[in-house]
């Protein structure tokens, strides 16, 4: 029952990775109940990072913890291989990658070859990152089954829990995480855990939910899921990936810098509106976890 944070990547106003803020955020998360950090995921703006930046995030976070799944996906296969090779210097939990995106009607054999190439170079366990909405390609359970001897786990960012369960039913030993914030409770109770972007600013809520589930207080855990959904609905109105940066400061009390285009920082009036709208939910959350 793992709570996995797809950790955001803090940037300066000039668009450089703020390594000190990244290190501090990683430490806070691990110290406050998060089990693993998913580095260079969607929330970390991984697809918009250079090869060098992806390695910088790994090096920075590794100074704090080795509880890391290192996402290396790219359309440049040479960059992917270089990152996988570089990971040999780090004692981490695993390597992950989304499939090649953009190119339509990609033959299944190309997809299999992509992940096989990573597995052949990787000294670590391999996790597949399935995000059909973003990549345009669904790595179904039947496709994953063909790679079952190569991989350890899978992150399925999908609003359909039954889709995630298909992997677990077909491959019981595969570690399966759902990546939807609205399904954290169901992922913790039905799968191996949840990769939840909201845990960047609500780690205490995720920790409390896990405690409720473990102690059999299911109704209390469901109430926390409802509060997560409220926060999620508000953040989406302003652009969820950008809003997370401001919500970390609001809920946790420290600065994590800015996002970077094409995920642009919010305008000042948007920040004020976001923080104003989140206040009632924040109070509900404080009461629920106290």
Curated annotation (Swiss-Prot):
Temperature dependence, free-text field: Optimum temperature is around 90 degrees Celsius. Extremely thermostable.
Site entry: Proton shuttle: 129
EC code: 4.1.2.55
InterPro entries referenced in this protein's UniProt entry, alphabetically: Aldolase_TIM (IPR013785), DapA-like (IPR002220), ED_pathway_aldolase (IPR053415)
Keyword Transcription among UniProt keywords: no
Active site: 155
Membrane spanning residue stretches: none
Residues reported to bind substrate: 42-43, 129-131, 155-157
Gene Ontology terms for molecular function: 2-dehydro-3-deoxy-6-phosphogalactonate aldolase activity; 2-dehydro-3-deoxy-phosphogluconate aldolase activity; 4-hydroxy-tetrahydrodipicolinate synthase activity
Subunit structure, as described in the record: Homotetramer; dimer of dimers.
Cited function: Involved in the degradation of glucose and galactose via the Entner-Doudoroff pathway. Catalyzes the reversible cleavage of 2-keto-3-deoxy-6-phosphogluconate (KDPG) and 2-keto-3-deoxygluconate (KDG) forming pyruvate and glyceraldehyde 3-phosphate or glyceraldehyde, respectively. It is also able to catalyze the reversible cleavage of 2-keto-3-deoxy-6-phosphogalactonate (KDPGal) and 2-keto-3-deoxygalactonate (KDGal).
Protein name: 2-dehydro-3-deoxy-phosphogluconate/2-dehydro-3-deoxy-6-phosphogalactonate aldolase
Underlying gene: kdgA
């Amino acid at each position: 029952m793992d709570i996995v944070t797809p950790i955001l990547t803090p940037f300066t106003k000039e668009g450089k990775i703020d390594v000190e803020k990244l290190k501090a955020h990683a430490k806070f998360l691990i110290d406050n109940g998060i089990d693993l950090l998913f580095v260079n995921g969607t929330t970390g703006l991984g697809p918009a990072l250079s090869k060098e930046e992806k390695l910088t995030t790994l090096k920075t976070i590794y100074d704090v913890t080795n509880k890391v799944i290192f996402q290396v996906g790219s359309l440049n296969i040479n960059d992917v291989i270089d990152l996988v090779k570089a990971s040999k210097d780090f004692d981490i939990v695993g390597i992950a990658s989304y499939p090649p995106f953009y190119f339509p009607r990609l033959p299944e054999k190309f997809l299999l070859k992509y992940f096989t190439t990573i597995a052949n170079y990787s000294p670590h366990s391999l996790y597949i990152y399935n995000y059909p909405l973003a990549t345009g390609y669904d790595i179904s359970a039947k496709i994953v089954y063909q790679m079952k001897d190569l991989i350890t786990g899978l992150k399925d960012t999908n609003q359909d829990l039954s889709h995630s369960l298909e992997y677990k039913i077909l491959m019981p030993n595969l570690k399966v995480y759902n990546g939807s914030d609205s399904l954290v409770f169901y992922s913790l109770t039905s799968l191996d855990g949840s990769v939840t972007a909201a845990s960047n600013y609500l780690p205490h809520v995720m920790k409390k939910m896990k405690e409720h589930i473990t102690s059999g207080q299911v109704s209390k855990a469901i109430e926390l899921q409802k509060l997560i959904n409220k926060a999620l609905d508000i953040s989406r109105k302003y652009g969820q990936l950008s809003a997370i940066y401001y919500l970390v400061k609001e809920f946790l009390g420290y600065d994590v810098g800015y996002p970077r285009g094409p995920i642009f920082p919010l305008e000042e009036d948007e920040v004020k509106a976001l923080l104003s709208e989140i206040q009632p939910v924040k109070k509900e959350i404080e009461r629920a976890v106290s």
